[in-house]
């Protein structure tokens, strides 16, 4: 399978959002690549701002490099398909994710985001060349997923982050009636909370920002207001001194990592470090326990 894309000789252009340095974004224009045999041309409809993109905007992830043409949580409409594409057609609503070759060791293990064959940096110098923040883009069909045409594009754009959450839930081995604490009620924290609830778990959300507390409560979750009580002690109180079966740390902070460990029950407690943080959060574990 050939993933190389040549610049179009037809002269068609694409416009896209690009981070050029900390706190500076531009709308740029480049040649729209040719649609290869395994590619699709997408008319983009929506793209979420991931922590990866926002962190780069804040200057917290500058190791990723500039200029950054990110945007991997996106959705759009198929406008053209390559001759080898059989599972998509013009007019399909699709969500985008990472692309994989399907045959390297990482892909065979299901880690297509770490594919050894496909690199998202482009030949014309753009880092993280997902181009989700564009009017049109060409994607390999391996990273495009058909969704219902009547699905709101804004909802379809959540397919990739939801997939990461479900992957984490599987790693945690969540079971019905378990108590799960989610530290952080941001977008990803609440998706984690909703997923744990769908597994049949009792979900407790810990948060300190008033607006996020209100949102979590409006969604029906038990909420610990960290401004009013110690979250570790409150979890112990709510679980009759036992602690949580699982903790999902959806905040990239050393203090959150420490709290998560202290919230866990002694036997078979599991913790998922879901959020990245910069500077890199520390995790200190007592190896004698």
Model-derived regions, located:
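Residue-level recognition of short, solvent-exposed, well-ordered loop/turn junctions
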Residues: 36, 89, 175, 265-266
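Residue-level marker of beta-strand positions
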Residues: 73, 92-93, 106, 136, ...
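Glycine-rich beta-strand-centered segment in the early N-terminal region that forms part
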Residues: 33-47, 60-108, 148-150
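Glycine-rich phosphate-binding loop and adjacent beta-alpha segment
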Residues: 253-289
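Mid-domain Rossmann-like dinucleotide-binding core that forms the NAD(H)/NADP(H) cofactor-binding site
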Residues: 149-229
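Short amphipathic alpha-helix with an adjacent loop that forms part of the alpha/beta core around
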Residues: 230-241
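Short N-terminal strand-loop motif that marks the start
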Residues: 1-75, 135
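NAD(P)H dinucleotide-binding glycine-rich loop of Rossmann-like/cofactor-binding domains
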Residues: 103-183
């Amino acid at each position: 399978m050939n993933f190389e894309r040549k610049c179009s000789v037809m002269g068609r252009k694409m416009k896209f959002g690009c981070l050029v340095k900390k706190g500076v974004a531009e709308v740029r224009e480049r040649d729209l690549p040719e649609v290869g045999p395994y590619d699709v041309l997408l008319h983009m409809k929506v793209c979420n701002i991931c922590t990866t993109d926002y962190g780069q905007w804040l200057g917290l992830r500058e190791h990723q490099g500039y200029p950054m043409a990110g945007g991997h949580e996106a959705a759009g409409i198929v406008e053209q398909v390559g001759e080898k594409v059989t599972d998509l057609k013009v007019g399909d609503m699709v969500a985008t994710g990472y692309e994989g070759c399907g045959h390297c060791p990482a892909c065979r293990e299901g880690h297509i985001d770490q594919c050894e064959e496909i690199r998202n940096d482009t030949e014309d110098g753009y880092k993280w060349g997902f181009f989700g923040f564009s009017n049109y883009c060409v994607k390999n069909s391996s990273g495009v997923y058909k969704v219902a045409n009547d699905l709101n594009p804004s909802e379809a754009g959540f397919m990739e982050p939801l997939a990461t959450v479900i992957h984490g839930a599987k790693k945690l081995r969540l079971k019905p009636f378990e108590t799960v604490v989610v530290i952080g009620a941001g977008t990803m924290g609440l998706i984690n909370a909703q997923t744990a609830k769908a597994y049949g778990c009792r979900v407790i959300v810990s948060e300190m920002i008033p607006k996020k507390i209100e949102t979590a409560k409006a969604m029906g979750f038990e909420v610990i207001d960290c401004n009013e009580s110690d979250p570790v002690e409150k979890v112990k109180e709510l679980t009759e001194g036992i602690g949580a079966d699982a903790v999902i740390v959806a905040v990239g902070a050393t203090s959150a990592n420490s709290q998560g460990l202290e919230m866990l029950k002694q036997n078979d407690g599991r913790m998922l470090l879901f959020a990245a943080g910069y500077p890199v959060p520390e995790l200190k574990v007592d190896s004698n326990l």
